[in-house]
Amino acid sequence: MTGQPSTPVRPGSVVRTVRRHRGGRSATVQDMVAAEMPVAFNYNGVPFAVMMATPEDLEDFALGFSLSEGIVDHPQDLRVVAVDTFLEGASLQIEIPPERAAALDQRRRNLDGRSGCGVCGNESIEAVLRVPPVLQSALRIDVDALARALDALHARQPIAAQTGAVHAAGWADAQGMVQLVREDVGRHNALDKLIGALARARVDATQGFAVVTSRASYEMAMKAAQARIPLLAAISAPTALAISLADSAGLTLIGFARDHDCVVYSHPQRLDLGVAVGEPA
């Protein structure tokens, strides 16, 4: 049922009239669906990328994307001048130092239609497969902290609860207490928004860990490592390349994290499973 007007409920969701069939019955009802729109990134007045994203927490998105993509190295190197939203999309006006802007001229974009991107604008295999500086963190958590964070993440996803159509990324301290959560239709975007929120709040990312409601792709592992998050736990599986990157970058990568169960793919020293090595878990 296309072409009908939609009523905004919150930036991340809209109401649509749908025909629902359930249990042998059919009815016309109002349904909540996830909002998705193009978000344009403009650095120093020059268009750079267009991402398909959920139109919430866009300042966090601007900062997190810029940090995880290596456009800037420090939050103070960036200023969000304006966030312009309109019916068809949103435009982010971002200022960065001239030398950083010049470097962007060497990177090309082809992002239309993607819900997030983790290797954006790289023109060679070597650039894509770069390894961030090795993570140095004394973080150590136990499996109870991981389970606690997963439970809290599930409870702090209002858009997902309404629509069932978005990903979430959360950051928890070493005790598993979730401090920040961000949602988006794109898993990369959700993590970028979280990274931006951490930077804006001046949180030391090395003192906690991230949990995500998606698989752990190479791009997700790269973003976590770039943001100096020492442990990334995903509810689904990682890819082989993500594991290799995590191993090289000093990132603890966890997959299939659900309740007290998980699989640790790299740097297991940061997770205390409460069992001896070799003992069935």
Curated annotation (Swiss-Prot):
Pfam families: FdhD-NarQ (PF02634). The active site is at residue 117. One of its GO terms (cellular component) is cytoplasm. It is found in: Cytoplasm. GO terms for biological process: Mo-molybdopterin cofactor biosynthetic process. Disulfide bonds: none annotated. Its main location: cytoplasm. The keyword S-adenosyl-L-methionine does not apply. GO terms for molecular function: sulfur carrier activity; sulfurtransferase activity. The keyword Cytoplasm applies. Belongs to the FdhD family. HAMAP family: FdhD. This is Sulfur carrier protein FdhD. It comes from Xanthomonas campestris pv. campestris (strain ATCC 33913 / DSM 3586 / NCPPB 528 / LMG 568 / P 25).
